[in-house]
Amino acid sequence: MIPFVDAHIHLWDLNHIRYDWLSPPFSDDGPNGSVEPIARNYGVADYREDLARWNVIGAVHVDAGAAAESALRETQWLDTLAAVDGLPTGFVAFAALNDPDVDALLAAQAAHPRVKGIRHIVNWHADPQRTYGPVDLTVDPQWQAGYGLLAKHGLSFDLQCYPGQMPGLVPLIERHPDIPVIINHMGMPVLTDPDGLNDWRRGMKALAALPHVAVKLSGMGFIRRDWTMAGIAPLVHVAIGRCGGDR
């Protein structure tokens, strides 16, 4: 079986760190729908059991949505897991890039050798059922300045946004070729938008033209909660076609 590194996993101990999005009350509203089925502790042993049929030789933990003040605590907890269990092998931690103290936050995260990058979810959409926040942070000069500090600390950026935000992000990402960017969840096309599929195609084309941008084939359920292999395959083919097998 082909060995591979799982590029996007989440672990959590709800008794150790609070995750508001994993706490009741639960609702079908919002971009994630009801998360009640996964609102339980999920550790390395659970992950190994779920992945037993695959030859996983490493796994990258991506920030799991803890409160901002718990971001460093999450990294410290993951370090403990990695030291004992051998997983995760790398971390993409959280830092709010619009925080006035972001330079210190990035330095604190980068002090942990397993931290390779940062994710700050920036999905914004005019539809309140889709948006992750009240404003589009990607157009905020303070957020853009925080983004520019990632290279100073040797960190990549996991980009989770919607296709409508992609064209506006291109100039910023282009100005910083020393910050590797990894598009999360295939760029999260919003198929219910009037021109959602074409918005995604255009956005992915614009970002993929930058050689320091890669994409994860993940998060199919964000695109369609009732996704199937047959239904998602055309989108996977487009993503691979845009970025190539090496990205």
Indicate where each model-derived feature is located.
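Helix-coil boundary/capping segments in enzymes
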Residues: 1-247
